[in-house]
Amino acid sequence: MRNALAAVITGLMAVSMAGCGEGEGEGDDAFTVGLLLPSSAVPRWERFDKPMIEKRVKALCPDCKVAYANAADDATIQRQQMNSLITRGARAIIVDAVDVKALRSSVQAADRAHVPVVAYDRLAEGPVSGFVSFDGAQVGRLQGKALLKAMGDKAKQRRIVMMNGDPVSPNTAWYRKGARSVLDDKVTIRKEYANLEWRTDIARGNMTAAISDLGPGRIDGVLAANDAIASGVISALKSAGVSPLLPVTGQGADLDAVQRIVKGEQTMTVYKSFRQEADVAASMAVALGHGRSVHAIATTTVDSPTTQDVPAVLLTPVPVTAGTIERTLVRDEVYSIHEICPANLRSACDRAGLTGPTTKDTKETKEKEKVKGGDPGGVPARAGVARHLQAVRRRPGAPGRGTATPGR
């Protein structure tokens, strides 16, 4: 069994070497940054987060390398991957924990070996040195507000089903708390489910059970914690013949969810800028690898069940509806209109106002704007993450220094 597990770990561990050249002031001291992501089933991790983190590490530390591994939703494999990075001499590790409690022993082992750990998206237990995520309570509030708006003026008489995330994830409670702060006393929550591993098939089964227990005519909306869960909910509604479909929320800005929004099947999603999160994580890891504090990067502190006052950056999530896809996801180059609008969705895209330039035109426009000194897609052109974080601190409603307790 150990040999088989070692083979899996070796197979999953991919090392990409950053090139040489002038960096952005972090020096030329070469070291390894470990990057451990939780899943290959969720598209964002390997399509967006991995290359963006690698690119930012290279910009900050040209002679550094990134050692990457994906846990494929297996907490045991992730612990072994982390222990391997420690043994191989990684000087800092970025990790999005499959199971925040199960990873505690590996975080403690890293601490004993003087290897700082940056918790990414989910706050791992144990002595982590930094944390970057999005304000989970605000994610839930955005979902709750969108659901109330979609149900209309008579929302107080409406009955909803809450489809929460994986109970193992601390963010699940965080999102739920934010949503309940908006929904309580305004709707009746008829059923509430935990969806293990955020899986679409489990969400479909739970929604099918809710329809069977309550009757399709006695549900007026569904608070789905993320886009994978929303997919299962919508599939169950279709199978039950519910028409028109009910308002259903989401989170993650998955491409198939964006297309469901265009078609009118999903009410909204919540976009969390992969670029911003990746930039902060890479900046923290490189600073820690050079033996520096991350307090200059952090904008707040958070507490886990094991560790208090973890330096953190909690970024601002953005709601996305059919009417805002172009100025959020397309503008940030998450997806092109060509990707969102294949031939079979052209009419729906026209109705949603997605009639902008082609991918080629968009890229040319972006390059022209970068030459002029601006980048509409997130972090300003030629500006480091430090300047971006200063802007975050100045932004109205941005988290200040204090204590927040995360909970997906």
Language-model features and meaning:
Residues V15-G19:
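C-terminal motif of bacterial Sec signal peptides marking the signal peptidase cleavage site
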Residues C20-R408:
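A residue-level marker of the well-folded mature domains of exported/periplasmic proteins
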Residues M1-T10:
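N-terminal export and membrane-targeting signals
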